Structures are given as C-alpha cells and as structure tokens.
Amino acid sequence: MLKQQVGVIGMAVMGRNLALNIESKKYTVSIFNRTQSVTEEVINNNKEKKIFPYFSIKDFVNSLRKPRCILLMVKSGQPTDETIQFILPYLNKGDILIDGGNTFYKDSIRRSNDLMKCGINFIGMGVSGGELGALNGPSIMPGGSREAYDLVSSMLKKISAKFKNEPCVSYIGPNGAGHYVKMIHNGIEYGDMQLISESYFILKNVLNMKNEELSNTFSQWNKGELNSYLIEITKNIFLKKEKDGIHYLIDSILDHAEDKGTGKWISQDALELHEPLSLITESVFARYLSSLKDQRLIASKILKGPILKCISSQNKELFVEEVRRALYLGKIISYAQGFSQLKKASEKYSWNLQYGKIAKIFRAGCIIRADFLERITDAFKSNNVTNLLLTPYFSEISNKYEKSLRYITSYAIKYGIPVPTFASAISYYDNYRTMSSSANLIQAQRDYFGAHTYRRTDKKGYFHTNWLTKKEL
C-alpha cells in the first residue's frame, strides 16, 4: 500500500490551507482532526485532491512514509502538548514533528529537548501570512533540528512565499529560534499597526480628511518608502462600504482593538532581557487602553483637554508629508528595537541568528512585508550591526526625518490627540542619542536609600557614599 509523504494534524483554517498548499506542490497528504466531521468536510470540499483522511491517530501515523513528517497545526500551549503525547507512542526514532502553531518560544525549547531524548526530530516553525498566506505561500521561520530541516527544506521552499523567485524560508537556528523570530515578527506587526492607526487618526482629525481622501493618501504613500502590505490593505479598508452602498464600514467599527495574547510575549521577554522595546510595548498597551471603552466614555465627559486646531488648506500637503515622514521613522525605530532584541536573545541562547536572512524571509508572504526590508537586508550584510539606527541608510533617514517625528508628536500632544507609539518613538530616539543622560541621579538615589553603589566617570570600580550630613545623623 502506498504511503503518503506528509501528515497534517489540525484542520482549522491554517492547517487546512497548509495541507492544500502542500498537496498543490505534488505531495500526497494524510490529514487528521480530533473532530471527525471537520476532516470529512475538508475531504468533501477537495475530492479531486491527493489528500487522504484518517480517523484514528494510529492509522494516520501508519499511513506515512518513514521517516515520517508530521505538521501540527493545533492551538498553542496545552493542546499542542496533549497532541504530542497522543501521537508519540506511534512514532519511531528519526521521525519529524513540526509545530507550525503560534507557539511561545520557550515551549519550543522544552519540546525540542524532550523529544530529542526520544529520538524524535522537532522543528518549531513560525508561519506568517494568515489564511491566504497558508494557502498561497506564507513566510516560514523554522527552528530546531538542523538535520530535520535539511530533510524537509525542499518541501518548505516549495510551499513558501517567493520574493523575486527566492523562497521566503531559511533555517533560523536551534530549538526555539524559529518561534522566537515569529514572536518578534508579531511584535513589529503590533507596532506597525498602531503607528498607522495614529497616522490615520491625525489625518482624520487635524485635516478633516474623509475616507476617500484617506484612501488616496495611503495609496500615494504605498508608491514610495512606505510600500507595504499593511499600507496597501489600509487604503482598501477606507473604501469598503456597508451593504447599503452608502456608508463606510470603518466608521461603524468599534474602537476596541482586541488581541490573542501573543503581543505580550515579546514585551515580557524584553523585560527579561533588559531590552528597551518601548515602541512595540506601547502598541500592546494601546490595545489594552482601547479596550476600556466604557471608562473612556465617562472620562471624555470629565477630563478636560485642549481645543483641536486644524491645519489650513494651504498647509495641508506639507502636513501630510510631515505625517508620512514621522510614520516612516517610527516604523524604522520599531524594527530597530525588534532586531536589537533578536540580537540579545541570540546571544543569550547561542542561536547565531543571521539577521539579514531573517529580513529576507519577511519580504513576501507575511503581514509585515515591506519594500524597506531590502534596506534591512543590506544593513545586515555585516552581522555585527549593533542597532539599525547606526547603519548608513537608516541613520541618514533618521537625521532627515527626526524633525517631522518631533513636530507631529508635539502637535498631537499639544492638541490632545493620543499618539502613544509616535511619542515612544521620539523618546527612544532622543534617549538613544543622548551621550550623558539623567540616569546618574537615579544611581545616586539608589545608593542613598539602598546602598546599591554606583560607578564614576573618572574612576573604575563601584563606590558607595554616606549621603547623610552629620546634622541629619
């Protein structure tokens, strides 16, 4: 009996579409889902395809060629652990388990170590692009066993997105490296989305832009430095109308930005690494604050603010350009923070991440795909870059656009428009470029009340001072 080449467990939309993607590249696929009716639905809708259903995990595993290649597309956390334990008794040494879920990287580190003891090859694989990306070609970030990756790399390259015919997949590094990169991707996505929404809010309120004009503005931006998937879909969103064909949908959507909880992972990890991920973390907090809709309604009637001053029509074009520049620099700072955290994690876990290759993976198929990733790839031709802001292209843009970021942020603050990520961006920029900061006072305070010591600018070593005068003693 002929056996299938790949197995997929989990037939929710991502697993289903990845199975279809794999089959479309001339692979035979076995599928299994805990709920039998879901498996039957997939088969009934794809009868002509070489996708074979199984309704017991034993039959599913036995249907696969050795070494078996099994892709897990189930909910992250405990459901993934339970699925692994469910399938483990039927596996043989050398088989490959790929976790393609939205998994926390520390779980992937643990699973990689545990499965290695059993002789099972584990790949923790970040997948970005949503349901359409899964079907047509996602950005893929595999980490874990290098031996296992080499066995499945041909398939992953075939199913991945392509940028100028180059597959958007590359081996990331050991154990949890792939899912860590996906976590950074998600954090940058949060930052991008919040920066764009703040830009929209400024244009709408300061310039009184209507939806068609907003769409035209974002369309123009998408032809230049800001060309990206998120800018592209934003221009489309503004034009979407209700079923009545009259009212715009965007105006009826509740301003409560939800999240699946993955955004907090990167911020929590930044705290563990002592990494100043301020912009991305602020974008997470902005979603949390948006969820306080009932409180905000009350606060809007109690708490006072300035009267908004609109820009005159003759200065409109100049103001739009200032917003564009501020958005671009904010985006650069968001990526700079994300890649700086990648570098810190790579050092901690000895992953030896290749940052230029990672930027290449993001160029197509994923949510944060953007033209300027080519610039990041170029910047990381030397893998020893400390911070993107210090590289030639990005430092030049930063020096050119910082006045715009400063102007738009201060204008928004002056007139009561919330811009948490713009404010965070310029604050990070100024802190990062400040040679002598206010932190010397903090160290003095820490030594005063806690004898935590301090270092000096003129001598080496750590020092403690008795800060109390004789009178105070």
Curated annotation (Swiss-Prot):
Keywords noted in UniProt:
Gluconate utilization, NADP, Oxidoreductase, Pentose shunt
Pathway recorded for this protein: Carbohydrate degradation; pentose phosphate pathway; D-ribulose 5-phosphate from D-glucose 6-phosphate (oxidative stage): step 3/3
One of the protein's GO biological processes: D-gluconate metabolic process
Active-site feature positions: K182, E189
InterPro entries named among the record's database cross-references: 6-PGluconate_DH-like_C_sf (IPR008927), 6PGD_dom2 (IPR013328), 6PGDH_C (IPR006114), 6PGDH_Gnd/GntZ (IPR006113), 6PGDH_NADP-bd (IPR006115), 6PGdom_BS (IPR006184), NAD(P)-bd_dom_sf (IPR036291), Pgluconate_DH (IPR006183)
Q: Which reaction does it catalyse?
A: 6-phospho-D-gluconate + NADP(+) = D-ribulose 5-phosphate + CO2 + NADPH
Which of this chain's residues are annotated to bind substrate?
A: N102, S128, G129, G130, H185, N186, Y190, K260, R287, R446, H452
State the SMART domains in the record.
6PGD
State the EC number(s). Answer: 1.1.1.44
Instruction: Identify the SUPFAM superfamilies for this entry.
Output: 6-phosphogluconate dehydrogenase C-terminal domain-like (SSF48179), NAD(P)-binding Rossmann-fold domains (SSF51735)
Q: Which residues bind NADP(+)?
A: G10, M11, A12, V13, M14, G15, N33, R34, T35, V74, K75, S76, N102
Q: What class of enzyme is it?
A: oxidoreductase
Q: Name one GO molecular function term.
A: NADP binding
Known partners and oligomeric status: Homodimer.
Annotated function: Catalyzes the oxidative decarboxylation of 6-phosphogluconate to ribulose 5-phosphate and CO(2), with concomitant reduction of NADP to NADPH.
Q: Which family does it belong to?
A: Belongs to the 6-phosphogluconate dehydrogenase family.
- Can you name this protein? 6-phosphogluconate dehydrogenase, decarboxylating
What species is this protein from? Answer: Buchnera aphidicola subsp. Schizaphis graminum (strain Sg)
Q: What is the lineage of its organism?
A: Bacteria, Pseudomonadati, Pseudomonadota, Gammaproteobacteria, Enterobacterales
Gene name, per UniProt, is: gnd
